[in-house]
Amino acid sequence: PEIIECYRAAKKQGLTKLEFLHEVAKIEGVYVPSFYTHTYHEDGTLAAITPEPGAPERVKKRIVQDMNTAYFPTKTIVPSTQIVHDRSNLEIFRGCIRGCRFCQAGFCYRPIRAKSADGLCKQAIESLEDSGNSEITLASLSTSDYRELEALADGLLDYCEPRKINLSLPSLRADNFSRELMMRIQKVRKSGLTFAPEAGTQRLRDAINKNVTEEEILSTCATAFSGGWNSVKLYFMLGLPTETDEDVVGIAELVYKILQVWRENGSGKKRGLSINLATAYFVPKPFTPFQWAAQITPEEYLRRVHLLQANLHAKCVDYRYHES
């Protein structure tokens, strides 16, 4: 809002783009790249960053302290054509308690700040009534870690259920999955469940600080399958630091263990399970413990993809990967 107000004032005063940039640079937390000169050593490393006169020597990171009082847009532009994310989005909290070593957002958006359930219900209803959307997503880095999730779900269901509005939880944790909560939330439309184990073996999950065990993953799937779910999405990464071929094959082994769990808990069915498996190409991110880790080559990534493909034979598994 401060930048928008500054822009409005600049337009009203007839300021040039450069004059506007000088004004907006006075706002705490705003960085204008063109106001800084970078010099380098002969080996290509950074020697110095020199600000122009009037620009702050160091831009201070600015953090929204209170999410309940922060601006949240409930009146959004509704496209005239169908779009991919054709739904309302509600940010329930910012930050993450987990600390996965590959996750840039988990480190950059600290500390954790949550909104109240009452305030979220109000924002959700305003957004849905203004947009006319038939689905709303409770967005965050780890939605199931929100402490007031059940109270929020109850409040939203009172509004959404009679209007046939779907309530979506995009980021679930295998170690705190609640079948009762999911049964209540998905009364309108039972969609698939999505989990991100990220690595195929416990050794590698521990190395990346993905604090979820194979037992928790299988137990969660058993709970979901016994509740009537027959579709699950699994996300992994290839090329994580210290990853070996054993870890890659471990992804396929975990998939087959999930298939066996479905056979034991899916109402005795032999068919009907859908496992959507996806692998991403790991890219080391700045400000994470893995920022200096080596990235595998595209050729090595595809070799690991083909290794995984060679170990996937079940017809119920749809495997997709990044080709570039």
Regions found by a protein language model. Name each.
Residues 1, 30, 70, 95-96, ...:
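Conserved structural-core and active-site-/substrate-pathway-adjacent residues in large, well-folded domains
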Residues 107, 207-212, 291-297:
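Short glycine-enriched, charge-decorated loop/helix-capping segments at active-site entrances
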Residues 103-119:
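Iron-sulfur (Fe-S) cluster-binding segments and ferredoxin-like electron-carrier domains
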Residues 1-50, 286-324:
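Glycine-rich beta-alpha loop elements in corrinoid/cobalamin-binding modules
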Residues 35-37, 77, 94-98, 107-110, ...:
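Short, glycine-/Ser/Thr-/acidic-enriched flexible segments
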Residues 125-274:
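Conserved SAM/AdoMet-binding glycine-rich loop
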Residues 76-104, 128, 169, 192, ...:
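N-terminal pre-triad scaffold of radical SAM enzymes
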Residues 33, 39-89:
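N-terminal [4Fe-4S]-dependent radical SAM core
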